[in-house]
Regions:
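Generic low-polarity alpha-helical segments
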Residues: 1, 21-24
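Cleavable N-terminal signal peptides
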Residues: 10, 20-21
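Bacterial N-terminal signal peptides that target proteins for export
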Residues: 1-7
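Bacterial N-terminal signal peptides
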Residues: 8-15
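Hydrophobic alpha-helical membrane context
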Residues: 16-17, 95
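Beta-strand-centric surfaces of beta-sandwich/beta-rich domains
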Residues: 23-167
């Protein structure tokens, strides 16, 4: 199945705080990042299929060691997106991710990030967040968050369900 001339794009909103090194109990100021796919994507399923699993490399261009405080996936067309998973890309997997996304349209990735082998993908690119219809943003409690290194990048896997294209 094919979505008729509908290119899809999504936005990832992230709030990051500088990593505290002085042990202060005061919550540091956050920086907000909005990251989008390099190019819009026209989902297509393999022959006789109804689903397209696609991964995209996202670079929030973080310039300092940080803590992820909030993260939110916002699809343009929710009726086509079954779920999305946001993965951390390790330094070891980054060259492969860059190569697979060289034209900015992502790569097929059923069952994980598509980086490394199928089984190592779950270990080498751990989940940071996920989204499904009805889910809002992830908000860490005060004083908590997910460490994020300077220059680190995300892969997001988007599962497009193309049955929605017909109705």
């Amino acid at each position: 199945m094919r979505i008729k001339r509908t290119l899809l794009i999504a936005v990832l909103l992230i709030s990051l705080s500088p990593q505290s090194v002085n042990g202060s109990s005061k919550e540091p100021a956050t920086k907000k990042y909005s990251v989008t796919m390099k190019k819009a994507h026209l989902p297509t399923a393999p022959k006789n299929g109804t689903d397209d699993y696609r991964c995209f490399l996202l670079d929030p261009k973080v310039t300092e060691e940080s803590i992820i405080r909030t993260i939110q996936f916002i699809p343009q067309r929710k009726n086509f997106v079954h779920h999305a998973i946001i993965f951390r890309v390790t330094d070891a997997d980054l060259p492969q991710a860059i190569a697979q996304d060289k034209n900015g349209t992502g790569w097929p990735c059923f069952g994980g990030s598509g980086l490394g082998s199928m089984l190592s993908s779950f270990v080498s690119t751990p989940w940071i967040s996920s989204w499904a219809p009805g889910r809002g943003k992830d908000i860490s409690p005060t004083g908590y968050g997910t460490p994020f290194k300077k220059g680190e990048q995300f892969v997001w896997q988007v599962h497009y369900n193309l049955l929605a294209a017909n109705g």
